[in-house]
Amino acid sequence: MRIALLSYRSKTHCGGQGVYVRHLSRELAELGHDVEVFSGQPYPEGLDPRVRLTKVPSLDLYREPDPFRIPRPSEIKTSIDLEELLTTWTAGFPEPKTFSLRAARVLAGRRGDFDVVHDNQCLGTGLLQIAKMGFPLVATVHHPITRDREVEVAAARWWRKPLVRRWYGFVEMQKRVARQIPELLTVSSASASDILTDFAVSPEQLHVVPLGVDTKLFQPREGRVRNRIIAIASADVPLKGVSHLLHAVARLRVERDVELQLVTKLEPNGPTEKLIAELGISDIVHTSSGLSDEELAALLASAEVACIPSLYEGFSLPAVEAMASGTPIVASRAGALPEVVGPDGECARLVTPADVDELTAVLGRLLDSPRELRRLGDNGRRRAVEVFSWQSVAAQTVAVYEKAIARVAAC
């Protein structure tokens, strides 16, 4: 099968979407399929040699180290470039739409090259153009971004709320496009339920295929650091619940030596950075970002507890990576987290989202119980190996491709 895999951002440091592209494309190639990734910036790294990469460049207005840069007039070459610039200048996020339009232009010249096109969370209007060209189309919706919008609007000060709503303006487009794609993949039953509610798609459109984990890379190791907690957040946003964990860590340090390894890129002088200083825990909170896979795996395996305090997750790759590492988890009872980690007390302890008292108490009890830490860690490793396989993800995804191909052939 010849597969075009579209992703408007694909670097693994940008979050789970990049991890998904890299591992899914590799396992599809392992099954004998021909895979070509079409990506906007930042481009993927570490793709399997059998997987081709076609770059779909944008103006890249969020690139480091000069985000929100002003492009040179000579860079504005098409109406799509102009739309990207104007949307950014008016506080919107253009990438899902503008990437999809550029991808449609590229694929228009390659109509005979692919059996199926698979979109990764873009859900831009360009996908409808791709479908009209006759390509069988599948899209992955990791979770409905309506949930991110809801949390961020609630957390924003009154004067920022309109700006947050404007930033998330692309969500209404994603709703409209999703309703017109017959085959949608998502990564958990919880996410599927939320997509049904928020996007008003039909149940027949949705196929649940949980994500996988590399259990050879993420595995238990010797030398865990006493009282070390690790948390991984793909973005410095209220949805990840990091502020609640920081308050818990500040309380824990009163009674014990404790250390937090926070893997995220903090907004300079942003709310999280300020909170760390206000709580007086700068000496025990160590932040890092841009880690290699090997560095992340080593750090996860060095901690006694992994904490996932999110207010919502459509899946949570850090959860399955922690389980594969044999690292016990304390996670919020939110979104798909209970579905991913299993019943409370099996591989993880579940707590009420945003409840600092409960989070502090559960973390403290776990850190005081080496036997419970070992039991949860062993169970987590077993669950990761038995349940979360990228090979299975690829095989189930191919089955959905076949449905999309058959649907188009029948028309």
From Swiss-Prot:
EC number(s) reported in the record: 2.4.1.393
Temperature impact on function: Optimum temperature is 40 degrees Celsius.
Annotated keywords: Carbohydrate metabolism, Glycosyltransferase, Transferase
pH dependence of activity: Optimum pH is 8.5.
MF annotations from Gene Ontology: D-inositol-3-phosphate glycosyltransferase activity
Superkingdom of source: Bacteria
Enzyme class: transferase
Activity regulation comment: Activity is significantly enhanced in the presence of Mg(2+).
Presence of keyword Lipoprotein: no
Pfam families, alphabetized: Glyco_transf_4 (PF13439), Glycos_transf_1 (PF00534)
Record annotation: effect of changing K240A: Loss of activity
Gene Ontology terms describing biological process: lipopolysaccharide biosynthetic process
Reaction(s) the record says it catalyses: [3-O-methyl-alpha-D-mannosyl-(1->4)](n)-3-O-methyl-D-mannose + GDP-alpha-D-mannose = alpha-D-mannosyl-(1->4)-[3-O-methyl-alpha-D-mannosyl-(1->4)](n)-3-O-methyl-D-mannose + GDP + H(+); [3-O-methyl-alpha-D-mannosyl-(1->4)](n)-1-O,3-O-dimethyl-alpha-D-mannose + GDP-alpha-D-mannose = alpha-D-mannosyl-(1->4)-[3-O-methyl-alpha-D-mannosyl-(1->4)](n)-1-O,3-O-dimethyl-alpha-D-mannose + GDP + H(+)
Function in brief: Glycosyltransferase involved in the biosynthesis of 3-O-methylmannose polysaccharides (MMP), which are intracellular polymethylated polysaccharides implicated in the modulation of fatty acid metabolism in non-tuberculous mycobacteria. Highly specific alpha-(1->4)-mannosyltransferase that can transfer mannose units from GDP-mannose to a wide range of alpha-(1->4) oligomannosides longer than three mannoses, including all hydrolytic products of MmpH.
Family, similarity comment: Belongs to the glycosyltransferase group 1 family. Glycosyltransferase 4 subfamily.
Designated name of the protein: MMP alpha-(1->4)-mannosyltransferase
Organism: Mycolicibacterium hassiacum (strain DSM 44199 / CIP 105218 / JCM 12690 / 3849)
